[in-house]
């Protein structure tokens, strides 16, 4: 039988490849001693070293984190993130244990689930290439080989112990971040290791208030083109005016990081603010004037506030009349948080739109029709930014001239060199006007007497 293709040949090529857009609405909590591997009293002694290769977990609720074994400050930060309204969909928790060379733990008095009453605490940790475990009977630790030497009582505080290892399971005790031994030189490598395993996060925060760790995270963040970081700034520190994370990111003119000051312990304003604002489309929001759940407002004096504002810091305060909000919503360099986030988003959007355009075309000519195709796609990306609220709408100025929110400048054939054409290179210039948010209003009026 003859092949029908001799008469009617039909071939279909699928041009359906799409570049994936970046993630700009997911936070990550860098949690030393995260202990999120789901171990229990009945299983912690039989765990294997290969069970702990993952450095991250993705959560959709705080209950899931608690079920996995997270506790203490790490769990409080997760709860603050998910307590906002509307509640965020996703949170990443990174095992940031590499930032500590030794981790301090403190007995909580909470019973170990499923254990005899005599067992006051249990722990599992990784040291080198070994998994070790131990239990505490109220007097001493006992467990696998080497465990008793790895867990040393803190002479300065009863019920505290310094653990030499990466904690992967902990019950009956919690991590004490401020008393742990910091290894700030390992911070960048620790974040990079988490990122290499899972990169679908945007805004970093940490449960540690150690300044050297915060500075290292800020330095790493500033080197990224698609990441931001928020920090808790301990305003109660006696060295705040001369050495604080707010001052550090201000003095280094950092655009990718910002800090929220508080005098309260266990007040995770960073996680709360991230959870409140990351749910909003980049460009549609402001990070100022936001109410927060699961967070405590500070009672700063006007002098306190002016000191913080002078360093482009942020606060969460009670203004009376039921208004308890964040302010002013600025990064270390003084730019609005939402503007930095939007610009990262807009750059990613245009890059990925152009990539999708080119990989699905057999050829885009290096001529005026080809330039028009490229410019149209760039305008489409900018229009998406305008629709999102990050670029101002077109308007008519006082002279009656139309001012466009964005403009893509078409290159001419004469402007493109032969070398560019041979190499396939093309430069297209564009500009847009940012749509800033109103955060402060001065209403000035006059009270008059009729008849005068």
Write out the residue ranges for each language-model feature:
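Surface-exposed assembly/interface segments
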Residues: 1-452
